[in-house]
Amino acid sequence: QFNKIQTLIKKGIDEGAKLIAGGLGKPVGLEKGYFVKPTVFADVDNKMEIARTEIFGPVLSVIPFETEDEAIKIANDTPYGLTNYIQTKDQEKAKRVAKKLRSGMVDVNGAGIAIDTPFGGFKHSGIGREAGEHGLQEFLEVKSVGGWN
């Protein structure tokens, strides 16, 4: 995973994203192990690989937008859909946007997601759910029977 994240950070630099913090290599004082520098990119275009890939590391890609609809379009324009994050004081906006996001989970204002709610993604981020009633359904077998009146 460390090597994959390093490759993606390098790709972000090579594709022209502006490196704001972090970058390649390990954090000072954490040379042992597989630690990655927390990395922030600005001026990211949604066509860049760092915007289109689930990195699973401490890498943030900042993509500017003008309107709510544009933000939703950018967020949904990826083959993945594990989770999204919304930061707003407007609860109606949070509900409206969350409904339009194509991801298995949406975190609003850092509240986190309850441990007993279904966990899983959309698109290439996996199928099925873990936890909650939907997680239990993964262990059930459904049978259809026909032929009597």
Regions found by a protein language model. Give the residues of each.
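Conserved C-terminal structural/oligomerization subdomain of aldehyde/semialdehyde dehydrogenase
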Residues: 28, 32-149
